[in-house]
Amino acid sequence: MSFSSILSQDITDDITPPAYSATLGSREQIVFRAYQNEPWLAGTASNLILDKKLVIVDRELLFQVLMVENITKSKLTQIDDIKTKLDPKKQKVDRLRSGAQGNGAKKYEVITQVDMEDDGNVADNNCAKENNSNNNSSAAKNKAVFKLTLQSKSGDVFFAINSTPISWSSCMLGSKIVILPGTVFNRGVFILKDSQVIFLGGINRVWNENRDQKFCDYLESKLQRDKQLVNGGSKKRKAND
């Protein structure tokens, strides 16, 4: 079995990695060591894991990605984005109206004359607006915080968030990552810096079938749960009044 084949498999299955060789490339050596290392907190009860505060990772750890969530954007916005991607006809009218307006209030202008020689300026202005929009989008991506659900080869599940810009939006489910020594682990969550994680790639094709629809259903269920929690809290407050 090759190292590349490990990237496409479920690491919780019984996998026999190829024998170590000094001729392996640096990337393959990292995969080998991370797979052979003892899984993080294997067999530790979940309540004890949550008690672990600011623990420093002391070895290379291999994980597979079960879920990627952009926690910078609201669930409702992400649901709308996915539904629009799946079926552009379902894009909400208010988003179409406000798309070019940015965050400011909608403004109207009364046109009293048309300068036919001003087409060049209009084109330049439109180009400038598009560039500004692209720059704003790029800046937003750099500021995005992602929550990753990770699984070790022992089957234990952990979470991770990035503390420096790391773009996980295109990460496929089943992708493999190696978390490096020096990473901080706090109450069940790895705090990732771009210099402390290696993205290996890979994909689990079964997990990614109808991925967008599955993720949309997942977000909708979480949104519904949040609403129930809010409504439940409101009812309790009314009962106590």
UniProtKB/Swiss-Prot annotation:
Domain of life (superkingdom): Eukaryota
The GO biological-process annotations, alphabetized, read as: cell division; DNA damage response; DNA topological change; double-strand break repair via homologous recombination; meiotic cell cycle
- Keyword flag Lipid biosynthesis: no
One MF term in the entry's GO annotations:
four-way junction DNA binding
Which UniProt keywords are present, listed alphabetically?
Cell cycle, Cell division, Cytoplasm, DNA damage, DNA-binding, Meiosis, Nucleus
Under the heading Pfam families, the entry gives: RMI1_N_C
- Tell me which GO cellular component terms the UniProt record holds: cytoplasm; nuclear replication fork; nucleus; RecQ family helicase-topoisomerase III complex
- What Gene3D superfamilies does its record include? RecQ-mediated genome instability protein Rmi1, C-terminal domain
Q: Which residues form a coiled coil?
A: none
- InterPro entries membership: RMI1_N_C_sf, RMI1_OB
Subcellular localization(s) per the UniProt record: Cytoplasm; Nucleus
The annotated subunit structure for this chain is: Forms a complex with SGS1 and TOP3.
Q: What family does the database annotate?
A: Belongs to the RMI1 family.
| Role | Structure-specific DNA-binding protein with a preference for cruciform structures. Also binds single-stranded DNA (ssDNA). Functions together with SGS1 and TOP3 to maintain genome integrity. Essential for proper meiotic cell division. Required for normal S-phase progression and DNA damage response. Required for resistance to the DNA-damaging agent methyl methanesulfonate (MMS).
Also noted in the record is: Present with 1500 molecules/cell in log phase SD medium.
Name used for this protein in its record: RecQ-mediated genome instability protein 1
What organism, scientifically named, is this protein from?
A: Saccharomyces cerevisiae (strain ATCC 204508 / S288c) (Baker's yeast)
- Lineage of producing organism: Eukaryota, Fungi, Dikarya, Ascomycota, Saccharomycotina
Provide the gene name from the record: RMI1
